[in-house]
């Protein structure tokens, strides 16, 4: 198409140039003709006759006719030249008339001067010749003009054809351009529609991904809740069975127990009772039921002869207040099958005697009546510290039972089976009383049964009870254990479990030195895994903390590598969130009551933001008209301690966490203003609150701030906490090793990399040096 247009334009240009050249030639010819006419008129010859005038007029007419050129400029020039020729012809005629008049006058007035006829004839002949030549010139000019007119007609027809062709080509070009523009618009509309459809599909894809993620999280949460409910039901069933058996035993033991339960102060070696601050929720309901039975049933002489009496009840009144029971109910959260209560029931219940019970019952043949006589004699002895020794000697007394009592083939109504049922009930009560002794007795005074009860119920580690039974016989031995002894003697392969035991032992050692147990001892692993992680917005790590039995003491010793290696916390921000949550607990001296009181006061007011939970931060975000972005903070790890104690977490970081697009400057500026109004004055307020409710930010706590070193076990304590500036650098992911130098324990696992070496190192070994008898 473009080539055709170019060729057409070249042809049109050539035709126009040829026409211009022909017009130029015509002008030259007309100029020559005019010059010849001027020469003829200037030569003095006779003027042109009528024929010449007619021919000139005809020539003028033909010239005027020939001037009909499409090019108006050429026509105008031709017309001017024709009119000029007509004027010249008219002048010639006038000159001819004047000459004729002069001739007549000269013939009439001057006869003497009259020329001869011969001369006149000669002049006339000359004039006729000149006129003939002028006629010939005019005829030639006519012929030339006719020829030019024909050529002009041909040229006009060619120009018309060219114009028609050019118009058709232009029409085709216009149609092509119109179609091209239409197709281009259609293509642009199609591209825009595709872009909109792509954006819609992208939004739908991300919406589906978000819904799938939410559905997965919801399903996981529902599954975990279902598992927790199932485990809770199992725990409740186990506690119910244990309570029924304990109540049945207590119903029969009430007369003798009532006679032995004497009010008064509990005295150990003449000193006041050593009280531990932690309440055990497991024994609250049992001790309350026991107290009710003591004061409601009168003694019966027949029961006094038929029921065995445990010496542990003589000097340990089981009185518990309603507040303690309520606190126990609050702190008993659902847990898995490895919870301390379920383990207590599984070890204390007599339906399936395990290796521990087999070790406790040696095949020594002795009648049940002799055992009763022995107990009646021991009742008459003086009650004092020796009675506590007899409490832990019950394991030796139970060894006198016949192993045949555990045979399932015996009749349920036989005397042997009844005696077995009584022994199981007393064993359960003995275990509960031993747990009670853990609360009221220094660790150095513990016996083997108390150590086992502490390890199983308080520390929630029944998997190590068998090795503890074989190797640890008293609390003094437990205080002298090193990390190597814990690993090889008790089979504690997990470094976090070893750390938990070491921190607890050191806490009890400090308590014996004159200080009370740390407030961190009140924070069990159930509260840490369920309540605390949910408060800081990281409930997705609850199962890992639950599996590793992370309690309050463990929290105060966690390091970044512990979070990464053992607890699967790989995100830097989540690590900093956990560490800042621990820093907040440290500031309130690990007091749940102080923390809950401060959170209750700021629930409806935007004050004291350092103690805000993740849910309280979500509520604040909704209150400042950003509720469409509030759900993005769920399970994000953003809580009050991060907003106040982390200097690098500014308004930009908060906007990024909320998912506010970077182009929405008004929303980001609004968020920055709200944050500056709430969180900037929070530092001074947090210091005042810390001074009011707990340990000031600069003071060390009693668990990991003692500045000690235990050379025998490799346990090291470092005084002071890591400065928050270093945590801030770690939050910005610029310092990969932040918080690595913070902690209180060495991070050593037994064979974490090599499974074979782990099996060899975790093999249980017995040590004769650890088998220390009760003193």
Swiss-Prot record:
- Biased composition (Low complexity) is annotated at 51-64
Which compartment or compartments is the protein found in?
Cytoplasm, Cytoskeleton
Keywords in alphabetical order, please: Cell junction, Coiled coil, Cytoplasm, Cytoskeleton, Keratinization, Nucleus, Phosphoprotein, Repeat
Region feature Disordered, mapped onto this chain: 38-66, 290-427, 688-715, 729-762
Q: Which domain of life is it from?
A: Eukaryota
> What sequence ranges are listed for the domain SAM?
446-511, 524-588, 612-679
Please give the PANTHER family that the UniProt record associates with this protein.
Answer: KAZRIN (PTHR12776:SF1), KAZRIN-RELATED (PTHR12776)
Similarity comment: Belongs to the kazrin family.
Please identify the protein, giving its name as recorded: Kazrin
- Record gene name: KAZN
